A protein has these predicted regions:
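Short, charged low-complexity linear motifs
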Residues: 123-131, 162, 185-193
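Ser/Thr- and Asn-enriched, surface-exposed coil loops between beta-strands
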Residues: 155-163, 194-198
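A short local loop/turn or secondary-structure capping micro-motif enriched for an aromatic residue
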Residues: 10-11, 73-75, 156-161, 210-213
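Generic detector of ordered, mature protein regions
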Residues: 78-80, 130-132, 160, 204-206, ...
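Self-processing/autoproteolytic domain segments and adjacent N-terminal interaction modules in large
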Residues: 1-151, 165, 171-180
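Solvent-exposed serine/threonine-rich low-complexity stretches and specific carbohydrate-binding patches
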Residues: 149-157, 225
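Short, compositionally biased serine/threonine- and acidic-rich segments at solvent-exposed termini, linkers
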Residues: 173-225
Length: 225
């Protein structure tokens, strides 16, 4: 695409099939000189499921962006070029294995760009262990020798299509979606404690709760421990 405008690609039906592992640039979308605004990359899989990637630059306008999205088998193969294994014990997520990853890879290349990116996947690609399938997911990136910690958030789905969004991405490469075991079962928006005479009033607000049964509030006796 020679236009980097946010309306360079629009969709009413259909989409771009990126599930091509033949190499030589096959199945990739190249956008020249990306500009501001949310950019839709309307990928579909070989079954016609709509799995868009939405990329919204926050800085670095004018960068060239190359992006692809590929379905895999449950063992996460075929791997993208440059990735030879998933189970790396020296990575930042100790013990990451094929059981922890959604069955899809994404590859993005861009230089000097910072953006918010949303990745979509089909529920059929969610082959995580049953107890993790509806948990929070995070975006992981291959560094060349290991994986970054999960970042961003989105809930796992077992029907339809799921989406996970990562903010302020400035380093690109090979991305996957992992069960985010580091995430709390709640997304906390606010927490306040106010003195009222001899008591303390505590209020909090959550944006989302997953498998959360109750809250436990603890008070320090000495203000330190």
């Amino acid at each position: 695409l020679m236009s980097g405008d946010s309306q360079a690609i629009t969709r009413t039906a259909g989409g771009i099939i990126s599930d091509d592992h033949s190499g030589s640039g096959s199945g990739r979308v190249v956008m020249k000189g990306i500009q501001s605004g949310p950019h839709l990359f309307p990928f579909i899989d070989e079954n016609g499921s709509y799995l868009p990637v939405i990329l919204q630059p926050t800085s670095g306008f004018g960068a060239d962006v190359t992006i692809s999205s590929n379905h895999t088998a449950q063992d996460n193969r075929p791997f993208p070029s440059g990735l030879s294994t998933v189970a790396v014990t020296t990575d930042l997520i100790a013990g990451l294995s094929t059981d922890n990853l959604i069955d899809r890879w994404w590859e993005i290349t861009a230089s000097g760009l910072t953006a918010n990116v949303s990745f979509s996947y089909s529920a059929l690609e969610n082959t995580l262990p049953i107890d993790l399938r509806l948990s929070y997911l995070g975006v992981v990136r291959w560094t060349g020798s290991g994986w970054t910690q999960p970042a961003g958030s989105g809930l796992g789905v077992t029907l339809g299509t799921g989406m996970v969004t990562m903010s302020n991405v400035s380093t690109f490469g090979i991305f996957g979606l992992s069960a985010n075991n580091l995430a709390l079962p709640i997304e906390l928006v606010s927490f306040e404690a106010k003195a009222k005479a001899t008591e303390v009033e505590i209020t909090w607000t959550t944006a989302a709760e997953v498998n959360n049964d109750y809250f436990v509030i603890e008070r320090s006796a000495d203000g330190r421990n």
